[in-house]
Amino acid sequence: MCTFSMTIKTFLLCLCLTACNGNEEVTEAETSSGYPSLLNKTVPVPAEYLGETASQGSVVQIDYDTRNYVDGNGEMRSNTAYVYLPYGYKESSDECYDVFYFVHGHGETAASFFQNENGMMRNLLDHLIEKGDMSPVIVVSTSYVYGTPVDYYPDADPYCKALPQELVNDLIPLVESRYRTYTQQT
C-alpha cells in the first residue's frame, strides 16, 4: 500500500460545482439566512465537457457484504457501489489515487451518479482530468437504500444515519484493499 497523501487538486471537482466569486456582494437576504445562496453563484458546466473525451475513465459495479446497521442486529446483507476509475488506471501500477465518496439524493440510486444526464458526471471527471484541472481520482458512489430502490422512501433518516457505519466498516476497507489508493499503514 502507498503511504497517506492528500492532494488539494481533487477538491476542484467540488469547487467546479459551486465556483463562488469573492468579489460578489452578499445581499441582505443572504446575510439574514446565515449563509450565502450558492445557487446564484454557480457556473454552468462548459458545453464541451458534456461529451465524451478521447481518454475515458471506466465505471465498474462492485457488490459487497455489509450488515444491517439500521436495526443493529448484525444481520448480513449486500449492497452495491459504483467506482469510477480514471483513464490509465492500472492494477499493476505503483501510482496511487485519492478517493471521493458520493451518496445519491433522495429517490436515486448508487448508479444514478454516473448514469443520469447521459453520464455527465463521468464525462465531467474525464474532462477535468484530461485538461489537468484536477488530478486523476477514484470516485465511489454508494447508496443508503436497502433492497430495491423506490421513488419515495418514507423514512430515510434511519438509513442515512446508518450509512457512515457501513462506509467505515465495510465499503472503505474494501475500496482501499481492491484499488490503488492512498492509505495510512497501521
Region locations from a protein language model:
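Non-catalytic cap/lid and distal C-terminal segments of serine-dependent acyl enzymes
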Residues: V26-T186
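Bacterial signal peptide processing site
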Residues: N21-N23
